[in-house]
Amino acid sequence: IEKRNIVIPFEMRGFGIEKRRHELYKIVKPSRYIKIYYRTSNIDVYTEGYVETCEISNFEELTNGQISIICPDPYWYSNSETVASYSQIIGGFSFPFPKSDEPFIIGQYNSQNLMTVFNSGDEIGCKIIIEGKSESDVSAVNPAIYNADTDEYMQIQGEVLNGDIITITTKTGNKTVTLEREGVKTNIINRLISGSTWLSLREGENNFYLRASEGLTNLKVKIIHINAYLGV
């Protein structure tokens, strides 16, 4: 996908134009990082890039100009994220505690290993976080995430120890597999099992389920998604 070029025209009116023009020069400098927000009644998104040029015609009757911004990543992203999660124990704490003597839920076992993510934008990658939680040293072995709609999967070979955090990013241009163990981060992309696919989220509903050779119930898994749009 090609990078995006955004051109923002503007016109300065009123008093103190020279001062405001110099203030603009201080902020909008060539090669400087910039984040652009766009909001309507139906959408609230942002994109990121760097300033290419800031051209101002200040010798005309009206002071106007344009800012050219280059965005290497052409997508517009929602300002909110969606998180689908799996854990064998689903927390149920709620405050204040009920005053009656009737039983109330403080947690419940999750018998489903299916996670559903709804993508309102264009097809895009996501972030997957796998965390080992168990009383033993080894939480799980060979964890895998399957796309129930396409039969594609990603599987990590080897053991997941208690306290391990594996972070997978599947976005084009930023595909990574990182293990955090005892505060040290390591690239473990070489532990992807042959046949694994960089999972993406299609438009609409996406269903995923979990598998592991051992210890599936000792895993906490999150799929983090931000809607992305090529056009707004």
Protein language model features and the residues they cover:
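Long, hydrophobic/aromatic-enriched structural stretches that serve as scaffold segments
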Residues: 4-48
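Short, low-complexity, polar/charged sequence segments that are solvent-exposed and flexible
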Residues: 26-30, 55-57, 68, 86-91, ...
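Solvent-exposed loop and beta-edge segments used for protein-protein assembly and interaction
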Residues: 1-4, 28-30, 59-63, 120-124, ...
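Oligomerization/assembly interface segments of phage tail-like spikes and tubes
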Residues: 1-15, 61-74, 206
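Hydrophobic side chains in beta-strands
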Residues: 10, 38, 51, 71, ...
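Intrinsically disordered, low-complexity segments enriched in serine, threonine, and glycine
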Residues: 84-232
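Short beta-strand and beta-hairpin "edge-sheet" elements
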Residues: 33-78
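Short, charged, solvent-exposed linker or helix-capping segments at domain edges/interfaces
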Residues: 77-85
